[in-house]
Every structure is written in structure tokens, then in C-alpha cells.
Amino acid sequence: MAHKKAGGSTRNGRDSESKRLGVKRFGGESVLAGNIIVRQRGTKFHAGVNVGIGRDHTLFALSDGKVKFEVKGPNNRKFISIEA
């Protein structure tokens, strides 16, 4: 004879792996060409001078230099540039 009532099942208990998004190199930091600066979904940050954009909207350095964050334009967009 069972001494515990049968437990029900649940349909919860899953979660997706984190995607490690965000800023990888901050303002004033030195970078080498090819270094990833930001991993993002969509263009939260836009590519400025000497910054390339990947097909998943990742921003990366096109040349060696220092990272510079700036807000400009009528819509106050955030741009990331590399200063040599």
C-alpha cells in the first residue's frame, strides 16, 4: 500500500541559456582591430568611425585605438567610435 499520494507532473522547469550580451569594452579602453566592443540585439548602439557591424548587430573595432561613446543626432542615438 502506498504511503504517499501520487505527485502530479509539472510543465515548468526550463530556461534558455544566457546569451552574454552587453558592452565588452568600455569608454577609454584600448582595443585592437577585430576586438568585439558590444554584443547586442538590434542597434541599441550604432557604429561610428572605425567600427564595423556584424550580421547579429555585434559592434567590433576596425582599427587599433581607444573606444569612444557619444550621443548625437536628433534622436539622441548612441554611437561608438574608435579614436586612433
Curated annotation (Swiss-Prot):
One annotated GO molecular function: structural constituent of ribosome
Leader sequence residues: none
Keywords: Ribonucleoprotein, Ribosomal protein
InterPro entries: Ribosomal_bL27, Ribosomal_bL27_CS
GO cellular component, one term: cytosolic large ribosomal subunit
Lineage: superkingdom: Bacteria
Region Disordered: start-end pairs: 1-22
Biological-process GO terms, alphabetical: translation
Bilayer-crossing regions: none
Family: Belongs to the bacterial ribosomal protein bL27 family.
Name of the protein described by the UniProt record: Large ribosomal subunit protein bL27
Native source organism of the sequence: Shewanella denitrificans (strain OS217 / ATCC BAA-1090 / DSM 15013)
